[in-house]
Amino acid sequence: MSNRVVIIGRPNVGKSTLFNRIIGKRYAIVEDYPGVTRDKIEAKAEWAGKEFIIVDTGGLVPETKDELIREVKKVVEQEIPKADVILFVVDGKEGLNPLDQEIAKYLYPYADKVLLVVNKIDNLRQEKNVAEFYTLGFEKIFPISAQHGKGVGELLDEVVKYLKEEKVETVEEGIKVAFIGRPNVGKSSLVNAILKDERVIVSPIAGTTRDAIEIPFRWKDKNFILIDTAGVRRPSNVEYGIEFYSVGRSLKAIDLADVCCLVIDASEGPTRQDKRLGGLIERRYKGCVIVANKMDISPWSEEELEGIIRKELFFLDFAPIVFTVATKGKGVEELLNWIDVVYKDYTKQHKTSFVNRAVHKILSEKPPPRYRGKEVKVYYAFQESTKPPTIVLITNYPDAWKENYKRFFIKKLREYLNIKYAPIKLVIKGRED
């Protein structure tokens, strides 16, 4: 097992700030109120020649009645036994809190690998606050300022003493899959069903997943990187701050993905927001699988719902539809199989001679309308790139290619190039271009 360093503590003590400081970039969302990081986030880190996985957990609040915090507590408790080092973070500016004492009780069985991190020690006056934390009973205490980096180097020097000399096993390449959808349609449940691990907190509270979490995964000798994102809400429902930042990350996840799983609620059918999200995927030329989740409570049969989806999301006509019940694991294997199929089409490359034959076959069947009374010709065609498959046509009249004809042309290209389940980007240029 790879070296694992787990950051835990009650909400708003600076765990995510420390996480970001260690990995050197803004990964977890940081805001000044409790509960901002609600999911477990992992990233690769290195210090003094040793590599490790750093884990940022949600806030641990024992005995809380709040449903969400209970879920986070469970995740953290699952992580503690697997950790090589536990960074127990407390707030040195605020001082010792009763919740710190409650959390400490959970950690006493693992005291030999606990480093007590007193954060927010920004000046000499605050350094006096460190002494009271010795009452928690942990031997090694490190005053730091995660925000300014003070003391973090000394902390990491101690961390690496606990680590084994090994390389972190990571999936450097893989099919990047983003789960996109409105809040509470079951994206995190799908990720959990795939991973068979409660890595992402699942709660019926809409908007639970705030961070975009990249999770390497292997299935049937194929590498995947699953990206679980915050539910995307319409702008009118998003206030500035934490949700705004998460929506931006969700859109970024679409840009990073090879295949987007557009998750819709089968009990509601496709909504206006689903259409908007589908439009984002289409305009970015991403591979797509439409996932109709919660089929166990859908008022429609699979055949009926497929007809509705095809009508409402007609612009994603290349995307296969998978019906799932994520909480029961139903449809997960089929989903993974379709992701693989879509990716194969998304990365398909054809020789120029093959592309030219396909293009001229389409033109012979139905040429574009004449332009100002003149014949529209294609001098040659070629595939410029993949992800998406991009076909370039060199023509005498680029302006003659209207949208209706381009849609027809792309549909026929998909047939003749055997790219059935991925978008094709068509680029039309004149000779002078």
From Swiss-Prot:
One Pfam match = MMR_HSR1
**Tell me, what is an example of a GO biological process annotation in this record?**
ribosome biogenesis
Report the CDD domains cross-referenced here.
EngA1, EngA2
Q: Which domain of life is it from?
A: Bacteria
Residues reported to bind GTP 1: 9-16, 56-60, 119-122
The record, for Gene3D superfamilies, names: 3.30.300.20, P-loop containing nucleotide triphosphate hydrolases
Which residues are noted in the entry as GTP 2-binding?
A: 181-188, 228-232, 293-296
Q: How does it assemble?
A: Associates with the 50S ribosomal subunit.
Protein name, please? GTPase Der
What's the gene?
Answer: der
